[in-house]
Amino acid sequence: MPALRSVLLLCWRDIGHPQGGGSEAYLQRVGAQLAASGIAVTLRTARSPGAPRREVVDGVRIDRAGGRYSVYVWALLAMAAARIGLGPLRRVRPDVVVDTQNGLPFLARLVYGRRVVVLVHHCHRAQWPVAGPVLGRIGWFVESRLSPRLNRRNQYVTVSLPSARDLVALGVRNEQIAVVRNGLDEAPASSLSGPRSGAPRVVVLSRLVPHKQIEDALEAVAALRPQIPGLHLDIVGDGWWRQRLVDHVRRLGMSDAVTFHGHVDDVTKHHVLQSSWVHVLPSRKEGWGLAVVEAAQHAVPTIGYRCAGGLSDSIVDGVTGLLVDSHAELVDRLERLLRDPVLRDQLGAKAQTRSGEFSWTQSADAMASVLHAVQVGEFVSGVV
């Protein structure tokens, strides 16, 4: 088997982007592990205000240009120009290209053919309406019809079995879908020995965007405050929806019971998790739910919606956390966990044990095996 020498990663954001989240962390961590193994890794992505046009992060060479949507145009032009020795990617000679489809593909197939792997964390049907009626319909058409047809001879990678099933529903052949699950950054040792809060604290670890449905967590805490004195909600993360949530908290009359921490460093994040009793992830769609396993490191169980897809993989229902089917059930299960320390501790202990099964080294090794297969014209399917 020929050596894998160079990989080009395409993603609309990188981990340093103000709106970067779990999917960007996945690509950066896997890319860093591949780079550490001697592979030349280049990430082409958008350029946020203040970000350098080029830099190297953890061995990954990052090349930035374009905004939220123009990133796709500039990346396609850069790839096409590189084929004739021009442009910012002219020195990149990838053996394999990873086209990360966060709703929209980079159309790398048009330039690199079968050497392209399409990485899909989850399908975006539930999120496209936020883009407006016209753009939303166009986006969903591209994601659900155009992309599967264009990439019908390409390898797909996703991060959970539910996401793989969603791809099959869009017409992608199961034989072409590999599942490479998320890894996990180890929690700082100092954060694992901190005390649990004496008063009941619920945490949400998430980007603040509409499809994460943070309002559901706010309303659940508001409903339970009269029955559970001292109940407090910590929201770790930021996003363009933040002010809407702050206003919602004010309307609920519970500004003193909610803390918006914003973007914080890893040590602070893990100290907040360590002090929490329960983690709530009310998102309407998740590819995997990295926050679930981050909370699990601290023996904090997660409650999430079954319909979110990937949470059915990251949460083992009734073992490491709880899956619910409605907001009313979310409120009911949250109250149950807050009132039942035995159940809470049992779920948390099993969640913590399971968190030890995941690492970025393992994820990168799995991804590398898929990339090697693509390099020689083969497909990989199932959990790798």
Model-identified regions with their sequence ranges:
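Membrane-proximal helix-turn-helix segments that form the acceptor-binding/catalytic region
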Residues: V134-V157, R165
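Conserved donor-binding/catalytic core segment of Leloir-type glycosyltransferases
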Residues: V157, S193-V221, D234
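Carbohydrate-associated surface elements
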Residues: P162, G183
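A short, well-ordered alpha-helix in the C-terminal region of glycosyltransferases
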Residues: G230, L343-E357, A366
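Nucleotide-activated donor-binding/catalytic signature segment of Leloir-type glycosyltransferases, i.e.
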Residues: V246-V264
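Aromatic "clamp/platform" in nucleotide-sugar-dependent glycosyltransferases that forms part
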Residues: R284
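Conserved acidic donor-binding segment of nucleotide-sugar-dependent glycosyltransferases
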Residues: V316-A328, R336-V342
